[in-house]
């Protein structure tokens, strides 16, 4: 089945880490409220907070400064996330410079 072939292709999509900076407007919002899938086509896989890995009940999880969101997204959708001051993309990703 080719339905997921593009989104699962490592040349088209991948996993990135995004840190929530201390001055972010998303602090205090739940993962669901962030609407990352609707806005960027990104899926939150887990959240790292200090020494915890949160991977359950993610829609209700409330974001704090310093949280690291682990996302899966198409590479072309990551550039807009990187341009958003509410997030700091800390993973290198392929950029389309055309």
Locate the predicted segments by residue.
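Cytosolic regulatory regions of ion transport systems
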Residues: 1-98
């Amino acid at each position: 089945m080719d339905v997921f072939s593009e989104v699962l292709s490592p040349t088209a999509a991948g996993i990135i880490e995004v840190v929530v900076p201390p001055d972010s407007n998303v602090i205090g919002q739940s993962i669901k409220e962030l609407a990352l899938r609707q806005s960027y086509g990104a899926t939150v896989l887990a959240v790292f907070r200090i020494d915890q890995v949160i991977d359950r009940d993610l829609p209700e999880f409330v974001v704090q400064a310093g949280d690291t969101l682990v996302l899966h997204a198409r590479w072309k959708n990551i550039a807009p996330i990187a341009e958003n001051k509410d997030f700091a993309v800390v993973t290198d990703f392929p950029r389309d410079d055309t």
